Amino acid sequence: MYVVESKAGAIGCMILSLCCLGSWPAILTLLERRGRLPQHTFLDFATANLLAAIVIAFSLGEIGKSTFLKPDFTTQLPQDNWPSVLLAVAGGVLLSIGNLATQYAFAFVGLSVTEVITASITVVIGTTLNYFLDNKINKAEILFPGVGCFLIAVFLGAAVHASNAADVKEKLKSLPSEDLYSSIENGEDKPEIEKTDVESQEKLAEKAKAGTAGFYVELENKRAIKVFGKSIMIGLFITLFAGISLSLFSPAFNLATNDQWSTLPKGVPKLVVYTAFFYFSIAGFLISLILNLIFLYRPMVGLARSSLKKYIYDSKGRGWAVFAGFLCGFGNGLQFMGGQAAGYAAADSVQALPLVSTFWGIVLFGEYRKSSKRTYALLVSMLAMFVAAVAILMASSGHRK
């Protein structure tokens, strides 16, 4: 199997992983904003995620010479390593539930802020756990200041969200139609605007430039998850739940591949990254399949009811959802490969993915467009702190013996 031997190789894996894991949320957000049901999107996403793990296992997991301590993927499959397999399965379930929750949080809280909050929880809980599980192979004097920088960036991100929310509220007050603004406040549908008055809808679309009040109204009319009039606590609760789930999957994977609790029978080698990732991804796919099949018929947060037949025939946006799944799958694989070499605490530097997600949020969705100078100043400060956090966490990486 292919093994990352050098610190430089591990850091390279982390950088590539950061780009992949920071980009797929933008694709899911794009599809939801275009009106595709999140249940349909996540089924495609989860399938591609599993395929990525299979490709990695049967390619990188089979390269090179197989040894007793580092067997290749197919050699290890029949071995008696179920305690570690169950830990990998637990990690896959946690990641999948966390990703599923973030998909809904993106609509309520926004792409950038959702990623900031979930990443902060992951850094505080997950990175600290990984540091001790890895027998402190990372440099604490560098690692924890990096965590501190990340937390500062989190508070800056919260300030960005508050400032931008105030900007948006002020823009919506400028709408010329009091009735239209009332519908936004109460979350009510206006059939005369959305369905019958095509001319008014076209005029609104013509004026809807990113960052304007018309832009937010048009977005609400198109998107799958309606958010106007909904309590912000719904989104924050979903985001908090997602963050806790995501903070625990990496320590579970760490335990699966390094057996710190000595659960394996004597003489059985530890799970290699590729075998653990294979079981990890199968578990994630199965829990995603079960939950989203339920959500097709019993949808959450006021979504339209669907069916398996409707999902099969809903090909619009499927290619993008599959692409997002591959990005997530390969991103996770690269994170684990880098973590095996440099320590999972350092590999958790990929949780600075809000840096990438914020970039896509600005470029693709016009987030913070036409905002106040205060919002821009806070945004630049947050991004600068994220850059510092990534650099410091990567510099803390040690080398597993």
UniProtKB/Swiss-Prot annotation:
Single GO term (MF): ATP binding
InterPro entries noted in UniProt: UPS_plant (IPR030189), Ureide_permease (IPR009834)
Positions on the Extracellular side per record topology: 1-10, 62-81, 126-141, 253-275, 340-344, 396-401
GO CC list: membrane
Membrane topology note: Multi-pass membrane protein
Sites where the protein binds ATP: A224, I225, K226, V227, F228, G229, K230, S231
Tissue and organ expression note: Expressed in developing seedlings, flower filaments and stigma, and the top and bottom parts of carpels in siliques.
The entry's keywords: ATP-binding, Membrane, Nucleotide-binding, Transmembrane, Transmembrane helix, Transport
Membrane-spanning parts: 11-31, 41-61, 82-102, 105-125, 142-162, 232-252, 276-296, 319-339, 345-365, 375-395
Compartments reported by the entry: Membrane
Top-level taxon of the source organism: Eukaryota
Membrane topology (Cytoplasmic): 32-40, 103-104, 163-231, 297-318, 366-374
Function: Proton-coupled transporter that transports a wide spectrum of oxo derivatives of heterocyclic nitrogen compounds.
Family recorded in the similarity comment: Belongs to the plant ureide permease (TC 2.A.7.19) family.
Descriptive protein name: Ureide permease 4
